[in-house]
A protein has these predicted regions:
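C-terminal motif of bacterial Sec signal peptides marking the signal peptidase cleavage site
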Residues: 16-17
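Hydrophobic/aromatic-rich core segments of domains that either
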Residues: 25-34, 42-52, 111-114, 204-224, ...
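Secondary-structure boundary elements
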Residues: 31, 39-42, 49-249, 285
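A short, amphipathic beta-strand motif
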Residues: 364-375
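Short Pro-Gly-centered beta-turn/loop motif in secreted/extracellular proteins
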Residues: 406-421, 425-428, 516-518, 659-662
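Short acidic/polar inter-strand loop motif in beta-rich domains
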Residues: 425-435, 528-534, 672-678
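Structured interaction patches on ligand/partner-binding surfaces of diverse proteins
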Residues: 427-453, 540, 680-688
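Disordered, acidic Ser/Thr/Pro-rich linker "stalks" and the adjacent N-terminal cap
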Residues: 453-508, 514-517, 530-615, 619-628, ...
Length: 693
């Protein structure tokens, strides 16, 4: 009995300690809330006889300290016409759907919706932009502006779900507070509407569903949003307006899409959160997505408006992403925001008190301990990943705590099969290396490149590796034939050429057999196994000595080495079946290596009279990441925590020659065009080896 009493006493002590801590934080927020203190205290007094709601109110107020954003000062005259039209569209769509009693996605329902939508747009497309919206924005901390009425309405609404829904009642207190109760889903994101608005808009579409099936709920949400935005033209305004943005195409990126999706699902009783990946392995940018908590306690990832969560997350592509962070409403004490030493620089991506690393729910992660022997007072070091979309060329993706006694740093959440740059930051935000960049293989083994002191002359041909998917398409073009005939129906025809090898991602020639020529009609015919003309550029080459009038200058073949400069054939010209200006709309003649007539099996070239075509100069569909003559390039070398420029040059040919220390990690930038870039080494055979193949 004594032992049990001690346990109970200790538990009550913990509870009182937690309560005391929350009360202290509430008092702190009240002390800095100025004129709005009365509103916040009104909320606490309102719930003094409802202990559960009082605890919820304290949780929200205690965590307001760092929540800050633009918010909308609403008034009835803000956008009355838009309010009227969106309500009308919502009502028309809702009644169209529920006039039928069979499947929500039945084709007959879709026909009815389309009919109603067409009529609505005829009447209102022009009206939408007749009246400009007048949004009055202010920027402030939440504790300075959220009113008692807004907070009480929100808390009452959320607790009504707790009363009605078993799934909400089953949630732990922590999950309820973090994933249903919050009035915002992304910190610092503009706040225009609260849960009562979102509920009134969406819940009527969900009443016939079992909300334990989060997949069905998300599928219905996606259907509703994708249908309603067809009732309006492209977004005509220059600023945010609130949830009515969902009625339009053309304004959203993934951030508001995720924010609205999660906020609306929460307002309808579905535990949800917004997450983002720090960056990608090879590409610029990052992505925000949603997650929902299913009845089995599993977090399922999805993209609001465009994808449905699956029970094993197999539909969510994770192969190219770095660490995943979830936005919480409460302060997360194990983040750099709180762990930094006074004056220590925290990278922008981690300068938030609301981040939680949740990478392991979608990807394998491992702990990693690295040596750290740098001087200074930093508490934190970082593993960064390459990203060409930021000036520094790197983005920190995870943090580690420095142990100066053991001279190491421990990272708790590191993804294998990724390339990392170990860095720390000065108080002014300058990055420095505390180790050489390395690849962490799938087994968690660190692999480093050996950098030698000698200087080598190397030839660079690309700024980004050839994409395997495009290589696969080029391989499938093997067996494609070039046929020629003097009959427009190609009956009969001669096979005058064939693609016998894998085409490289630049111009190359296929020689044609003209022993029976000349011919009036030519066609490139793909195989039955792969009936797709994935050829980005085509030129039909003839000899200038034939004296044909329907010719223009041919594009040069690539010059990939100094020896190629001697091989130019000045007798080659391009034969035309129509003036270039008339055919530039065609993918194979538009000058863009990234487009092709891939949907079609055949490309035809129809002359006015028989003429000799000696070669076809062709290029397979490709990402255009080779060196382009005439483009301006910069070459950087990784050195002690930063990319240092070692070359700036306008490419004369399709290669660049430079002297570099053997084994150096390099980054080649095209300043003229294109975004895809990736660091590389040059191996002992002079070949570029990108950090990801």
């Amino acid at each position: 009995m004594i032992k049990n009493s001690l346990v109970i006493t200790f538990f009550l002590f913990l509870l009182s300690g937690c309560a005391s801590e929350v009360d202290k934080r509430v008092d702190t927020v009240l002390s800095i809330s100025g004129a709005n203190r009365t509103d916040l205290e009104t909320v606490l007094k309102h719930y003094k006889h409802e202990p559960q709601k009082l605890k919820a109110a304290k949780f929200l107020i205690a965590n307001m300290r760092y929540h800050h954003s633009y918010y909308s000062v609403k008034n009835p005259r803000q956008h009355p016409l838009l309010d009227s039209l969106t309500k009308a569209a919502d009502s028309l769509f809702y009644h169209s759907v529920y006039m039928a009693t069979d499947s929500f996605h039945n084709g007959n329902i879709q026909k009815l919706i389309d009919s109603v939508r067409i009529g609505f747009r005829k009447q209102n497309d022009v009206r939408v932009s007749e009246q400009s919206v007048k949004i009055f924005w202010k920027e402030d901390y939440d504790f300075n502006w959220i009113t008692a009425k807004q907070l009480i309405n929100h808390i009452d609404h959320v607790f009504e779900w707790k009363r009605q829904m078993n799934s909400v009642r089953r949630l732990s207190t922590e999950d309820f507070y973090e994933y249903v109760l919050p009035y915002r889903s992304i910190p610092d994101n503009s706040l225009t509407d609260f849960s009562d608005i979102y509920f009134a808009f969406m819940d009527k579409y969900l009443k016939d569903l079992d909300k334990d099936s989060v997949q069905n709920v998300v599928q219905r949400y996606n259907f509703v949003i994708n249908q309603l935005c067809k009732f309006f033209p492209l977004y005509p305004y220059e600023e945010e307006i609130g949830y009515q943005e969902l009625f339009f195409y053309g304004f959203h990126d993934c951030i508001p899409i995720a924010s609205y999706g999660v906020s609306i699902l929460r307002a309808c009783g579905i535990p949800a959160a917004v997450e983002f990946n720090a960056c990608y392995k090879q590409f610029q940018g990052r992505h925000y997505h949603g997650v929902v908590l299913d009845k089995n306690g599993n977090w399922l990832a999805f993209n609001p408006e465009s994808s449905i969560p699956t029970s094993d997350n197999s539909s969510f592509d994770t192969k190219d992403i770095l660490n995943i962070y979830r936005f919480m409403f409460s302060e997360q004490k194990d983040t750099p925001f709180f762990m930094e030493k006074n004056g220590e620089y925290v990278p922008d991506i981690f300068d938030s008190p609301f981040l939680k690393d949740v990478t392991s729910h979608l990807l394998k992660t491992i702990p990693l301990i690295l040596p750290y022997r740098e001087t200074g007072n930093n508490n934190l070091a970082y593993l960064a990943a390459f990203n060409s979309g930021v000036p520094s060329g790197i983005i920190p993706v995870t943090w580690g705590k420095i142990n100066r006694t053991k001279q190491n740093v421990t990272f708790s959440s590191v993804i294998p099969d990724r390339y990392y740059f170990p860095v720390y930051y000065s108080p002014f935000g300058k990055s420095f290396s505390f180790g050489e960049p390395f690849y962490l293989d799938k087994d968690g083994k660190i692999i480093k490149s050996h950098i030698e002191g000698k200087v080598d002359d190397v030839t660079l041909l690309r700024k980004f590796p050839v994409k395997q998917g495009l290589v696969d398409k080029a391989v499938k073009l093997i067996g494609t034939v070039i046929q020629a005939s003097n009959d427009p129906g190609f009956q009969p025809c001669d096979t005058v050429g064939i693609i016998a090898d894998t085409l490289q991602p630049y111009f190359q020639d296929i020689k044609l057999d003209m022993n029976k020529g000349p011919y009036q009609y030519y066609q490139i015919k793909t195989t039955d196994e792969y009936p797709h003309a994935a050829l980005s550029e085509l030129e039909f080459i003839t000899d200038i000595r034939y004296g044909y009038e329907n010719v223009i200058a041919a594009s040069p073949l690539p010059i990939l080495s100094s020896g190629d400069t001697l091989s130019e054939d000045k007798t080659e010209v391009r034969l035309m079946d129509e003036p270039l200006e008339r055919i530039k709309w065609k993918a194979e003649y538009d000058g863009n290596p990234q487009t092709s007539p891939e949907p079609y099996p055949t490309i035809r070239f129809m002359l006015k009279k028989p003429q000799f075509v000696t070669k076809i100069r062709m290029m397979p569909l490709n990402a255009d990441n080779g060196i382009i003559a005439g483009n301006q390039y910069e070459l950087f070398c990784w050195n002690n925590g930063e990319w240092k420029k070692i070359l700036s040059e306008r490419a004369r040919y399709n290669y660049i020659t430079v002297s570099i220390p053997s084994g150096s990690l390099l980054w080649l930038r095209n300043l003229t065009g294109g975004k895809e870039e990736l660091p590389f080494y040059v191996d002992s055979d002079g070949r570029q080896k990108f950090i990801y193949p």
